[in-house]
């Protein structure tokens, strides 16, 4: 039987998973907790500084609260994004904008942060845990997306 290292994987965590974890809806919070526990059981958890910055806008979430949260949960923060992440995010964002123009899409707009999160996961060869699988499957067809 192989060692844990032979099958361990890294899972990147989207902002919406952490927000769901803090949600007052026990069903949503429980689903997010179960998904995080499952991902942690398969390997390590990581997120981008983009997620950290987005979470600072959540009500009642201070910088020190977030520092403690990430330390206690063992979710590592990748504070630096490589050039390849920025380029991949830019290409995906460009494709998204072109699709919106072509279809005259009046639906919700996406922000660059979503594409940085997806590109970070793709370039790091991580799976991405999210509640928004449609966006990431469309923008990053080669990314392994896990829906909460």
Regions found by a protein language model. Name each.
Residues 14, 48, 110-111, 132, ...:
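Histidine- and aromatic-rich ligand-binding microenvironments
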Residues 61, 131-134:
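Short, polar loop motifs at secondary-structure junctions
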Residues 62-66, 96-97, 146-148:
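Short, hinge-like loop/turn segments at secondary-structure boundaries
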Residues 2, 6, 76-127, 133:
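Active-site neighborhoods of divalent-metal-dependent phosphate/nucleic-acid chemistry enzymes
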């Amino acid at each position: 039987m192989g060692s844990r290292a032979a099958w361990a994987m890294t899972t990147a965590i989207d902002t919406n998973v952490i927000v769901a974890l803090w949600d007052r809806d026990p069903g949503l919070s429980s689903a997010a907790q179960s998904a995080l526990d499952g991902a942690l059981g398969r390997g390590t958890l990581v997120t981008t500084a983009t997620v950290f910055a987005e979470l600072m806008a959540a009500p009642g979430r201070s910088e020190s609260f977030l520092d403690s949260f990430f330390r206690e949960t063992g979710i590592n923060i990748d504070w630096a994004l490589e050039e390849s992440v920025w380029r991949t995010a830019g290409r995906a964002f460009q494709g998204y904008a072109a699709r919106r123009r072509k279809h005259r899409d009046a639906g919700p707009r996406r922000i660059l942060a979503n594409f940085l999160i997806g590109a970070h996961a793709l370039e790091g060869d991580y799976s991405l845990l999210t509640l928004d699988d449609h966006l990431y499957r469309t923008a990053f067809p080669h990314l392994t997306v896990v829906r909460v």
